[in-house]
């Protein structure tokens, strides 16, 4: 089974795309706006312009609750500086916060990757908030022994580790929906303007990024 794909248009487009289908598990990586929190390193800053961002109110307005099953799980990526906003979004989408998974970004040698940014501290972690909707919505049996930490190398800006997918598939029920997805994936429904097989970053980035090594070989 191949992934379903669509180009992101607006919030109503999500309902049309899902066509009445309800999802037991939703993974979302919204294009957050940092505004004054990180200044020139924010993704919406004109110097970077890596992808379009959305305001908090625009993200909250997405009809995620309408495409979520009555008994479902939500996994929501949020930068450390925007934790309060992430909790707002989770509530607006009809989910109750239950916990989180921490992504520790590491170098090849396994030590923390200090190339991150941050106004008060140099961030080497990112949070994946976990919330539930409905009744009898505990994680599946493997989830009850799963630690809430993953360690992996960074890829291109904002790209999340693939390791999280296997974790989610073990801990939560299908059908699976990913919002603001990149690339393609079997057994998931993918929604986003970068959800296609040809996706790769078009800016200089880390060596571990999607197809970065292939581009390097081409230049040589």
Q: Predicted regions span which residues?
A:
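Class I S-adenosyl-L-methionine-dependent methyltransferase catalytic core
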Residues: 1-220
């Amino acid at each position: 089974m191949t992934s379903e794909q669509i180009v992101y248009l607006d919030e109503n487009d999500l309902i049309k795309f899902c066509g009445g289908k309800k999802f037991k598990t939703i993974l979302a990586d919204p294009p957050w706006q940092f505004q004054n929190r990180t200044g020139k390193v924010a993704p919406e800053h004109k110097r970077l312009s890596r992808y379009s961002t959305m305001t908090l109110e625009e993200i909250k307005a997405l009809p995620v609750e309408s495409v979520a099953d009555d008994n479902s799980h939500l996994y929501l990526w949020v930068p450390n500086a925007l934790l309060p906003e992430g909790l707002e979004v989770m509530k607006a989408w009809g989910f109750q916060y239950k916990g989180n998974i921490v992504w520790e970004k590491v170098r090849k040698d396994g030590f923390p990757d200090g190339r991150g940014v941050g106004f008060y501290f140099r961030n080497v972690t990112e949070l994946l908030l976990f919330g539930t909707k409905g009744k009898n919505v505990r994680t599946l049996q493997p989830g009850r022994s799963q630690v809430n930490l993953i360690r992996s190398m960074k890829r291109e800006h904002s790209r999340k580790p693939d390791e999280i997918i296997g974790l989610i598939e073990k801990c939560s029920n299908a059908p699976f929906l990913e919002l603001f997805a990149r690339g393609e994936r079997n057994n998931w429904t993918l929604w986003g303007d970068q959800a296609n097989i040809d996706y790769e970053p078009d800016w200089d980035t880390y060596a571990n990024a999607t197809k970065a090594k292939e581009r390097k070989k081409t230049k040589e």
